[in-house]
Amino acid sequence: MLKTLTDAIAAEFAAAGFVLKRGRHFERVSASGRTHRYTVGVSKQKGWYSLHLTLGLLDRGLMAGVNAVLEQVLRDEAFHYPETWPPALVESTIKARVSHPVVAELTDWRSLRDDAETLEAFNARFGIWLRAFDSLEEVPDWQAQLSTSVTLSLEWFRSVDTAEWIEANTDYPALYLLNRRSAHDALQARYQALLERAPHAEEMRLFHKHLGAAAG
């Protein structure tokens, strides 16, 4: 099933400079040095297939810096882990948190619908990004929808592959970039905005603290 899906869009992605890696990731390195990744996630459970298409913007250089600060946060004595966690679990959690190079990820494609398009209309023409089926015969226009996913992904990559977008739309990468270019006022504004809605405010405050210490 995975090969059937990737074969259907291989030519379109190849024309845009992408190569297929590990059988499920279409990737290309842009002029900025960042990597654009389109992933076909498909699994089979109890006889039916589950498909989820995702997009990722990767920057190993940027995230190495971000993850170095994050590791300081996760090892800070002020950062609290559940009391029941053994040291091995803490270490494995830290390793997992500081090893990924993803700056931004798209998992819900509904945000890509046209400005004047209703959610119902979008779902009617493009719902394959998250779909369960027994066979592709249940999705008569699956090839056309996959082609649409290529078009939408290229538009998304164009929009997110800038420092300005990252600073305005991400969390730790944004703070790291703003700090790196000494944009103090913008850094504080972004930090306050993120802190107000942070699911883990303690972690956000510690990241800001260690970021400032690194700058000093």
Model-derived features with residue positions:
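Amphipathic alpha-helical segments
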Residues: 1-21
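A short acidic/basic microdomain associated with nuclease active sites
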Residues: 17-31
